[in-house]
UniProtKB/Swiss-Prot annotation:
Domain of life: Bacteria
Organism from which the protein derives: Chlorobaculum tepidum (strain ATCC 49652 / DSM 12025 / NBRC 103806 / TLS)
Catalytic activity: ATP + H2O + 4 H(+)(in) = ADP + phosphate + 5 H(+)(out)
Lipid bilayer topology: Peripheral membrane protein
Protein name: ATP synthase subunit beta 1
Length: 480
């Protein structure tokens, strides 16, 4: 629980956007204390700085319209708190823990400070275990870690949110734990659609949703991640459950911190980011960990400005992750969904000691084939496929079939694609890739491997297409 102080009253002395300065003649509010101000005490301010013996500076978590100098400010004496407990399941919250799903107030909860400490090293688990997603290209080439952190890196419109929601669907439907979705600075529409989709899928009972949308002040977007994390820690530490924490988008968290930094007068660092970017990100990321009794597995979408992976936001986020999934605009443009770039993505879980010799050797061979194909593309574009050696032509065929086999119809896009979603066990993925590399599908059309689940579907697809072609060819001339 956060430390509580006696309530004190002060006055507002300055307002600059979301930054509010206040004067307290008696006891100064401590850092992270919540102060209420406004005509009806409707504006919530979190204290970030003590300027001198009588003045403090804070960031408003709500809009400051109507706030004037000289208005009273009341120190609540406590930090920002979040509701924790089983009563939060199936509900949707804002940064303050208020329910925003129009289903009435939340019951059966207690309130905890959002400013917690990471688990001690002695409490952390060192066991490495793969977290299966049911998505072929991820499970084979970029396996995720149970209790680890994975990032989905990509620019605008390459499928980060779709991939994130597909993982929610696959994991919630087969895992016994709790999923918490945290929307930081994203579109209101996406949150509403996710809530409706999860409700229709029947998995909402084991989910909690927390949103700080893009139209909200930077203070709200900056703290909503801590609200969601506090809820996740309750399920991990108190109920000893497995928790899946999905964050969309961690870049918006950094962006909100940058806005706040500029408004409170800190000197900007490279590309205008706040000088404290590393500290702020670590305060969030280090609390995401697995202990001996429970685990928080986190998957985070990371927007990459202008597809520049040297951007400080992307660089600082990379250092906290056990797996990095890079989404390629080129692959998305070619229709390969999910648009995961197999050569740029990586995971520390892909080692032989973790996934086993068969999986490890296959993943290396798949990467080798795809890498050689990437090198040959320029030659093919200039001289044509016929100018390659017979061995290189066979390698190109394998690579093209692998690329198509790694595409997959998603449950969350059924209404758009018209294709039934597929979740594929890792054993089926390994079997399919091995058979492709053995050239068992050399005589199959490449389209037979596109947007399927297991490899057996390619055979069924080809049989159906062949039967239809034969029936059309056998149709008598002039027949109906």
């Amino acid at each position: 629980m956060g430390k509580t102080e006696p309530e004190q009253t002060g006055i507002v002395t300055s307002i600059r956007g979301s930054v509010v300065d206040m004067r307290f003649d008696e006891l100064l509010p401590s850092i992270y204390s919540v102060v209420k101000t406004g005509r009806e005490m409707e504006v919530t301010v979190e204290i970030l700085m003590q300027l001198d013996r009588r003045h403090v500076r804070g960031i408003a978590l709500t809009p400051t319209e109507g706030l004037c100098r000289g208005m009273k400010a009341r120190n609540t004496g406590s930090p920002l708190k979040a509701p924790v407990g089983k009563g939060t399941l199936s509900r949707m919250f804002d940064v303050f823990g208020n329910a925003i799903d129009r289903r009435g107030p939340v019951t059966n909860v207690t309130w905890r400070s959002v400013h917690g400490a990471p688990p001690q090293l002695s409490r952390r688990s060192t066991k490495s275990e793969v977290f299966e997603t049911g998505i072929k290209i991820i499970d084979l080439l970029v396996p995720l870690e149970r209790g680890g952190k994975a990032g989905l890196f990509g620019g605008a419109g390459v499928g980060k949110t779709v991939l994130l929601t597909e993982m929610i669907h696959n994991m919630v439907s087969k895992e016994s734990g709790v999923s918490i979705f945290c929307g930081i600075g994203e579109r209101c529409r996406e949150g509403e659609e996710l809530y409706r989709d999860m409700s229709e899928a029947g998995v909402l009972d084991n989910m909690v949703m927390v949103f700080g949308q893009m139209n909200e002040p930077p203070g709200s977007r900056f703290r909503v991640g801590l609200t969601a994390l506090t809820m996740a820690e309750y399920f991990r530490d108190d109920l000893h459950q497995e928790v899946l924490l999905l964050i969309d988008n961690i870049f918006r968290f950094i962006q909100a911190g940058s806005e706040i930094s500029g408004m409170i007068g800190q000197m900007p660092s490279r590309l205008g980011y706040q000088p404290t970017i590393g500290t702020e990100l670590s305060a969030l990321e280090e609390r995401i960990a697995n202990t001996g009794t429970g685990a928080i597995t986190s998957i985070q979408a990371v927007y990459v400005p202008a597809d520049d992976f040297t951007d400080p936001a992307a660089v600082h986020t990379f250092s906290h992750l056990s797996a990095s999934l890079v989404l390629s605009r080129k692959r998305a443009g070619e229709g390969f969904y999910p648009a995961v770039d197999p050569l740029s993505s990586g995971s520390k879980m892909a080692g032989e000691s973790i996934v086993g010799r068969r999986h490890y050797d296959l993943a290396r061979e798949v990467r080798r084939v795809l890498a050689q194909y990437a090198e040959l593309k320029d030659i093919i574009a200039m001289l044509g496929l016929e100018q390659l050696s017979a061995e290189d032509r066979r390698l190109v065929g394998r690579a093209r079939r692998l690329e198509r086999f790694f595409t997959q119809p998603f449950f969350t896009t059924e209404q758009f694609s018209g294709l039934a979603g597929k979740s594929v066990p890792i054993a089926n993925t390994i079997d399919g890739c091995e058979r492709i590399l053995r050239d068992e599908f050399e005589n199959y059309p490449e389209r037979a491997l596109y947007m399927i689940g297991s490899i057996a579907e390619a055979q069924e697809k080809t049989v159906i297409e062949t039967t239809m072609s034969e029936s059309v060819a056998a149709k008598p001339e002039g027949g109906n």
